[in-house]
Amino acid sequence: MSVLQVLHIPDERLRKVAKPVEEVNAEIQRIVDDMFETMYAEEGIGLAATQVDIHQRIIVIDVSENRDERLVLINPELLEKSGETGIEEGCLSIPEQRALVPRAEKVKIRALDRDGNPFELEADGLLAICIQHEMDHLVGKLFIDYLSPLKQQRIRQKVEKLDRLNARA
């Protein structure tokens, strides 16, 4: 397994729409494993393949305290959503920035697991929010897209400054 490079805004590759996975095979499973390694290394709770410049419909999530409840979503589809909620969300592609984003309180999805088996999942709370956030990535949408243009601009400037400082270090 290896840690992949996470793309940061304003990288346009984050705006690409991911294509469905045709077949869950050893290559896809390796991508899933590398994505988990990357997510844990970056101390995230979710990661979409788009964020590591792989434009396929793959998501990995682990919202557990002990970091031992891996969830793999390949070709996820949103079946139902209900209620309203929101928390201050962060994103590995938008480092050190957070903003309140409106989300559905509960979701029901259909996806394939790491072995290609179909399943359905009903989620609420942090897991539901994380699923929606990561599914947005698969269609090229970022949490800042829910914000006003002024807030988007401020966040972009802060991330670009942070990336410049990190490049010098």
Curated annotation (Swiss-Prot):
Q: Which residues form the active site?
A: E134
Q: Which NCBIfam families match?
A: pept_deformyl (TIGR00079), PRK00150.1-3 (NF001159)
Q: Name one GO molecular function term.
A: peptide deformylase activity
Cofactor stoichiometry and binding remark: Binds 1 Fe(2+) ion.
The record's similarity note reads:
Belongs to the polypeptide deformylase family.
* Pfam families assigned to the protein according to its UniProt record, in alphabetical order: Pep_deformylase (PF01327)
Top-level taxon: Bacteria
Q: Which GO terms describe its biological process?
A: co-translational protein modification; translation
The record, for HAMAP family, names: Pep_deformylase
Is Lipoprotein among this UniProt entry's keywords? no
| Presence of keyword GTP-binding | no
Q: Which UniProt keywords apply?
A: Hydrolase, Iron, Metal-binding, Protein biosynthesis
Name of the protein in its database record: Peptide deformylase
The organism named in the record is: Salmonella typhimurium (strain LT2 / SGSC1412 / ATCC 700720)
Q: What class of enzyme is it?
A: hydrolase
What reaction gets catalysed by this protein? Answer: N-terminal N-formyl-L-methionyl-[peptide] + H2O = N-terminal L-methionyl-[peptide] + formate
The cofactors named for this UniProt entry are: Fe(2+)
Q: Which Enzyme Commission numbers does its entry carry?
A: 3.5.1.88
The record's function comment reads: Removes the formyl group from the N-terminal Met of newly synthesized proteins. Requires at least a dipeptide for an efficient rate of reaction. N-terminal L-methionine is a prerequisite for activity but the enzyme has broad specificity at other positions.
